[in-house]
Amino acid sequence: HTRLRCDWSSDVCSSELVNLMCWESLPLFTELARRHPNTQMVVDHVGMIQPFVQPALTEPFADLARVISLAAYDNVAIKISGACTLSLLPFPYPDIWESLGKVFAAFGFNRCMWGTDWTRAVEFLNYEQGVEAFRVTDQLSDAERSVLMGGALEKIYNWSPNKG
């Protein structure tokens, strides 16, 4: 793992990759992405405020435009973790796809990585539901699903399950 060696107040950051949960700090994240173009930055949790208990938020994708604006920075990728907890409908969470489609269109699938976030989300769904919502949807082609469910992660994190 790369150690974080950044002086965020300067333009110097020697870290290769930084993951940040930034739902209440999107303007700061934007500034960091701009100032550190050689650092791969990953937005966690779709960049959205994530609920910890039911009911789901009434406007779960309220900051979508701000999150999508981060796609302008080539050094920014996004984890689609916790997306199912943003749904106002039960499994298979059909109301998340319009907003996620905008994220996919802005970032491209090569900068989007799936994740369940099920350990935080046990009040909303189990692991199987978090996986199956993305495996059974007709909103993704097989190629898009393959990149989203692992291909992008292997590239962004330079990791493979075969490396051990």
List each model region and its residues.
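Active-site glycine-centered loops adjacent to acidic/histidine catalytic or metal-binding residues
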Residues: D117
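Short, active-site-adjacent cap segments at secondary-structure transitions
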Residues: T85-L86, R120-V122
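Mid-to-C-terminal alpha-helical segments outside catalytic/metal-binding sites
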Residues: K102, F107-M113, V122-G164
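Single conserved hydrophobic/aromatic residue that forms the stacking wall/gate
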Residues: H1-V12
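Catalytic pocket-lining loop regions of alpha/beta-barrel enzymes
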Residues: S10-M113, P161-K163
